[in-house]
Swiss-Prot record:
Keyword ATP-binding: yes
Residue numbers binding GTP: 65-68
Protein name: Nucleotide-binding protein GDI1189/Gdia_1902
Chain segments carrying region Disordered: 285-313
InterPro entries: P-loop_NTPase, RapZ-like, RapZ-like_N, RapZ_C
Similarity remark: Belongs to the RapZ-like family.
Species per Swiss-Prot/TrEMBL record: Gluconacetobacter diazotrophicus (strain ATCC 49037 / DSM 5601 / CCUG 37298 / CIP 103539 / LMG 7603 / PAl5)
Binding residue positions for ATP: 20-27
Keywords per UniProt: ATP-binding, GTP-binding, Nucleotide-binding
Disulfide bonds: none
């Protein structure tokens, strides 16, 4: 099982390293990936990772956490780095997390022992694991916060992001809008990248530096740049041209990335504004669905500004839209959310407990 290729060139084989906090849903993510056709290996010795990938003939999902023999964040990142230099592989790191209070509640409900709390409390084990895996969260390609995320929606976002092209649950195109920081590297999955570093930078305003683009004051500051409206219009116009062509090519998932210096102010503001535009166009389509900008489907901290700018709906279809802020997620300030939900769920999933 591989993703479809272009011009006869095989697509890189996907290798997913799934890590995170115990009780946050890592095992649930691995089960979903197994249903999608991935070869799943949970907690192999780190020294065997290269051999596992070499022998596998299909996409691989490898679970790695504090229970893994020889676990060390630096060793995991080194293994990931070795995989990424191989042009025949597309290696990505997924980090599952949840708020401490949620993890405590889950452990209380299941009466399971935390792997790092053999001689202490569950709370102490959670805190130790957060510290132990901090470098992995900071380097993750995708941080999934399951605090308020029902299992059916977890399945939905994993399927939309990681299913092979021919097996994606959405019939049409799913659009992911991502903010990121250029110094942290370009998002490997990005189909289009826009550079917002020429806009006014709130970082140099002491009152705004500690905030982010989800804050209305920061969004207003960025939007006050005289070139901001034109830049946003041109990105919107470019997507109006390109996204329908992606659909014609059979592409099922498109990642549009906007970057700035720190990934917290200008890029976040633009992604939020673009998400509102696309969601507003979805509402104009028959059967379109949109989450309220003031009530995101899932966001850890902060709320998107609520002004809505809408363009015409004739250039683009009513597509599911996911918003992800990579740097904010790595810092625990935000997670992914729907800006516009799929019209219907393709998977009939029963809600249940998360597995670590």
């Amino acid at each position: 099982m591989t993703d479809s290729s272009h011009d006869g060139v095989p697509a890189p084989r996907r290798i997913l390293l799934v890590t995170g906090l115990s009780g946050a849903g890592k095992s649930s993510i691995l089960r979903i990936l197994e249903d999608l056709g991935y070869e799943v290996i949970d907690n192999p010795p780190l020294g065997m990772m290269d051999e596992i990938v070499t022998r596998a003939e299909q996409p691989v999902a490898i679970g790695v956490d504090s229970r893994t023999r020889g676990f060390d964040a630096a060793a995991v990142l080194a293994a990931l780095g070795r995989l990424r230099v191989n042009p025949d592989l597309q290696a990505e790191l997924i980090y599952a997390t949840a708020e401490e209070s949620v993890l405590l509640r889950r452990y209380t409900a299941t009466r399971r022992r935390h792997p790092l709390a053999m001689r202490g409390t569950v709370k102490e084990g959670i805190e130790a694991e957060i510290e132990l895996t901090a470098r992995l969260r900071a380097a993750a390609d995708m941080v999934i916060d399951t605090s308020d995320l029902p299992p059916p929606e977890l399945r939905q976002v994993v399927e939309m992001r990681f299913a092979p092209r021919h097996d994606r649950m959405a019939e049409g195109l799913t659009v992911a809008l991502m903010s990121f920081a250029f110094p942290a590297g370009l998002p490997r999955e990005a189909d289009m990248v826009f550079d917002a570093r020429f806009l006014r930078n709130p970082y140099y305003d002491p009152d705004l530096s500690v905030r982010n683009g989800l804050d209305q004051a920061v969004a207003d500051y960025v939007a006050s740049d005289p070139d901001y409206p034109r830049f946003l219009d041109q990105i919107d116009g470019m997507l109006g041209l390109v996204l329908p062509r992606f659909v014609r090519e059979g592409k099922k998932y498109a990642t549009i990335a906007i970057g700035c210096s720190g990934g917290r102010h200008r890029s976040v503001t633009l992604v939020e504004a673009l998400a509102r535009r696309l969601a507003a166009k979805n509402l104009a389509e028959p059967g379109g669905t949109c989450d309220s900008p003031g009530k995101p489907a899932h966001i850890e901290k902060g709320a998107a500004p609520t002004d809505v700018q809408s363009g015409g709906a004739d250039a683009q279809g009513a597509w599911p839209i996911i918003v992800m802020h990579r740097e904010l997620a790595r810092q625990g300030r935000s997670s992914w959310r729907w800006a516009s939900r799929p019209r219907e769920h393709a998977a009939d999933v029963v809600e249940g407990q998360y597995s670590s």
